[in-house]
Amino acid sequence: DVQCGEGHFCHDXQTCCRASQGGXACCPYSQGVCCADQRHCCPVGF
């Protein structure tokens, strides 16, 4: 698993995304990033 900070984990081959609310989300991409809306996950370069 991938650690995303305090007590938050994502599965292998996923990426952690820091949301605007200070939470973290798991992206289903190995190189994911937060989208501009800070709520969804996008592939890099999206």
Swiss-Prot record:
What Pfam families does its record include?
Granulin
Q: Name one GO biological process term.
A: defense response to bacterium
The yes or no answer to whether the keyword Secreted is present is yes
Bridged cysteine pairs (disulfide): 4-16, 10-26
Cell compartment(s), UniProt: Secreted
One Gene Ontology cellular component term attached to this UniProt record is: extracellular region
Instruction: Tell me which SMART domains the record gives.
Output: GRAN (SM00277)
> PANTHER family given for it?
GRANULIN, PROGRANULIN
Q: This chain belongs to which protein, by name?
A: Antimicrobial peptide eNAP-1
Per the UniProt record, the source organism is: Equus caballus
